[in-house]
A protein has these predicted regions:
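Short, amphipathic alpha-helical interaction patch
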Residues: 1-34, 55
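C-terminal edge and immediately downstream basic/flexible tail or linker adjoining helix-turn-helix-like DNA-binding
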Residues: 2, 57-71, 149-151, 159, ...
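Amphipathic alpha-helical segment used for protein-protein interaction
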Residues: 7-9, 77, 88, 166-229, ...
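Short alpha-helical interface segments
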Residues: 13, 37-61, 68-73
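C-terminal flanking helix
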Residues: 37-40, 47, 54, 90, ...
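Σ70-family region 2.3-2.4 aromatic/basic alpha-helix that recognizes the −10 promoter
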Residues: 62, 66, 70, 90-91, ...
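A short, charge-rich alpha-helical start-of-domain segment used by transcription regulators
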Residues: 74-95, 102, 117, 123
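DNA-recognition helix of helix-turn-helix
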Residues: 138, 216-219, 227, 236, ...
Length: 277
């Protein structure tokens, strides 16, 4: 059986936790985990990160968004169908939009329904609306396929264009570091921390919950649009990898990589908060 390093375990950790490895790959990792003091701790961090994401409180959809959509679609033949679709899927779409681009979430959702109406009522399914939303969110030019909400006075469209500038500064993402050579090649440079329970969620811990999800939301905003959408769809909304990949127009390998980057960055953002003092 080939020797597996900690670096190799981390590289496929998301696939391991999602049961996306074949039996041989899983057996190799299990063999390594049985004798490693660091990788089980790291995997525990990643499991907790995914659990925190799945428990993320539902976003509060602004009342103005419904009014903006009603105004944008008023007078159209299928406005009632659009209103029904918004009632059913609006919170889902707004949650994804806030993960991708929180300052433009309302514009993105509004534009989603405008485009769906252009396609016809068959587009008012959750799957198609999500696909349209992500496509709009990835559009560099707000003039191409996106409307500006009548309630938006923040200049957020310009901010979105700036954020997509290839020369703009991008956040440095958290990722474990490893020895590159010598007898310890592939081992963690610093052992992962065992996270405590003092800051984990509980019904009484409102302040701690706000702090925890403030870190999560900040980390999501550091990610690329497609990585943030992948994490939102799979870990927050609970959609399967396969459906998420289809909606984001990603291959199986690309959705795996997006989840890997996103989860590791959020894990890193939570590390200092969840590590006991």
């Amino acid at each position: 059986m080939p020797s597996v390093t900690c670096e190799q375990v981390v590289a496929v950790a998301s696939d391991f936790l999602d049961d996306a490895l074949d039996s041989t790959e899983r057996a190799n990792l299990d063999s390594h985990l049985s004798g490693c003091g660091n990788c089980p701790t790291y995997l525990g961090q990643l499991r907790t990160t995914i659990k925190v994401l799945s428990d993320r409180p539902s976003v509060e959809v602004p009342e103005e968004l419904r009014a903006a959509i009603d105004q944008a679609l008023s007078g159209t033949n299928d406005s009632e169908a659009a209103a029904a679709a918004y009632a059913q899927h609006g919170e889902h779409l707004y949650s994804i939009a806030t993960a991708i681009a929180p300052r433009e979430a309302e514009d993105i959702v509004e534009s989603t329904f405008v485009r769906a109406l252009e396609e016809g009522t068959a587009a008012f399914t959750r799957e198609r609306l999500t696909e349209i939303l992500v496509d709009i969110a990835e559009t560099p030019d707000p003039g191409e396929g996106r409307v500006s909400s009548v309630y938006d006075h923040s200049g957020s469209a310009d901010a979105r264009v700036d954020s997509l500038d290839a020369d703009a500064d991008t956040a440095e993402l958290f990722y474990p570091q490893f020895y590159s050579e010598g007898i310890d090649a592939g081992a963690f440079l610093e052992s992962p921390n065992a996270w405590g329970e003092s800051h984990m969620l509980s019904p009484e811990a409102d302040v701690e919950t706000d702090e925890l999800y403030g870190l999560v939301d900040g980390a999501l905003q550091d990610l690329s649009a497609s990585d943030a959408a992948a994490v939102s769809l799979v870990d927050i909304e609970g959609i399967s990898r396969e459906v998420a990949a289809q909606q984001l127009n990603l291959s199986a390998e690309d959705i795996s990589a997006a989840l890997h980057r996103g989860r590791n960055h959020i894990r890193g953002a939570l590390d200092g908060y969840l590590t006991p003092a």
